[in-house]
């Protein structure tokens, strides 16, 4: 099986992992956070922008995403996150399946973390 890493140059890593991995026609992107921004809306957009860059680096687009998992530091931020996420996927013919939930804490004080996986 052909397996390769997908990297995000200049991005801070918080552990020993790849930003993404593609194996055959399937890909997985590690959770993306954007702690350089304040507020859940801006952090959500920042994480989505990183995902777009990773997808582009792998020759993929948002259309290739099959599943998104969204972790929130505070479930009360769900509506604000959902507004930004909804705008991101509004043009997709088939929206990704998704799970969203609160976690006790996220890396580096992030308010939101987004994980995606999909296929070519």
What is the meaning of each model-derived region?
Residues 1-66, 72-120:
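N-terminal presequence-like segments and the immediate start of the first folded domain
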């Amino acid at each position: 099986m052909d397996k390769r890493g997908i990297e995000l140059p200049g991005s801070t890593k918080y552990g020993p992992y790849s930003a993404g991995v593609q194996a055959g026609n399937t890909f997985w992107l590690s959770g993306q956070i954007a702690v350089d921004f304040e507020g859940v809306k801006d952090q959500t957009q920042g994480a989505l922008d990183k995902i777009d860059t990773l997808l582009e680096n792998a020759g993929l687009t948002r259309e290739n995403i099959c599943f998104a998992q969204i972790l929130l530091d505070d479930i009360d931020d769900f509506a604000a996150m959902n507004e930004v996420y909804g705008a991101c996927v509004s043009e997709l013919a088939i929206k990704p399946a998704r799970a969203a939930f609160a976690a006790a804490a996220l890396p580096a004080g992030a308010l939101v973390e987004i994980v995606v996986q999909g296929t070519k």
